[in-house]
Amino acid sequence: MSTAGKVIKCKAAVLWEPHKPFSIEDIEVAPPKAHEVRIKMVATGVCRSDDHVVSRSLASPLPAVLGHEGAGIVESVGEGVTSVKPGDKVIPLFTPQCGKCRICKHPEYNLCMKNDLMQPRGTLLDGTSRFTCRGKAIHNFISTSTFSQYTVVDEMAVAKIDGASPLEKVCLIGCGFSTGYGSAVKVAKVTPGSTCAVFGLGGVGLSVIIGCKAAGAARIIAVDINKDKFAKAKELGATECINPLDYSKPIQEVLQEMTDGGVDFSFEVIGRLDTMTSSLLSCHASCGVSVIVGVPPNAQSLSVNPMSLLMGRSWKGAIFGGFKSKDSVPKLVTDFMAKKFPLEPLITHVLPFEKINEAFDLLRAGKSIRTVLTF
């Protein structure tokens, strides 16, 4: 029996309050309105940014259905939708691409002005949500809300992908992989023969390493205080791994000594102010490029001596690896299917959706790279 045009009752993980576990609830998901798409989720990754909402280091309205790194199948579409149809495999996009705003029209930049990242509303574009639970409206999360068996997104926040793609793997392209990989190949524009340093070896940091290797870097130095992550980093392309705790001097000085004055490209993939500074200073003063990839804490400022930049260093940042989402996500899935990069090594755990709190425990304990929840 078709569910198009009807309210769907399903399971979702609702975060009612900060610092609390997710609650598996029976929710109602309303049909998509004009220019909206309802998706039956198949798989979703668990990302550190979701946990930032739990801890309130990232502000977003609650109660909410979180999750933003998923893949699924279109169940129904609202009036006027032309880019996808029921049955299509899709990836929801936490960075939408309206195609009309100043940023979407820019040849390089990607953070569409209709995003829900800068000042989160926790709604779809029309200012409302399609989720209700116990008679109460439940907020969306950054245009996606993948921690639900069904979700509704704006058409500008969904991309059709290869119908043969394995959704339990390519869901990582919805956030973590693309963010890291793009930071290397698109934002920094790593060059063949160059030297790179990557601070932080979670799923995004390892994806930076994959990108540096794909771009032809000659040396990729992985930096983390957890030595258990070194083997995986080397498997994916790191040529050396170092632990800052093994040295009595600042890690930027160690890297400068290792690389004749500093690396060509450095990446901070943790979200700490001190490592952002270390990453900046570890790249060469005259030609280095440092990229902020990790999400920093809310309402904190970074103080840097301007002389650190005056001699020629560049300091950059980008969301979603600088990729224009609707244009790039289908191409990235095609590249994965063509074996141009791996995703499997990033997935350390696959759990049923109902075990979402166990997945977050693994994340917080540093025991997982990416956990994929399946519906």
Curated annotation (Swiss-Prot):
Binding, NAD(+): 200-205, 224, 229, 293-295, 370
Entry keyword annotation includes Membrane: no
Residues modified to N-acetylserine: 2
Main localization, broad class: cytoplasm
Sample GO molecular function, one term: zinc ion binding
Subcellular location(s) of the protein: Cytoplasm
CDD domains per UniProt: alcohol_DH_class_I_II_IV
Free-text comment on the cofactor: Binds 2 Zn(2+) ions per subunit.
Modified residues (N6-succinyllysine): 234, 340
SMART domains given in the database record: PKS_ER (SM00829)
UniProt family annotation: Belongs to the zinc-containing alcohol dehydrogenase family. Class-I subfamily.
Record's protein name: Alcohol dehydrogenase 1
Lineage: Eukaryota, Metazoa, Chordata, Craniata, Vertebrata
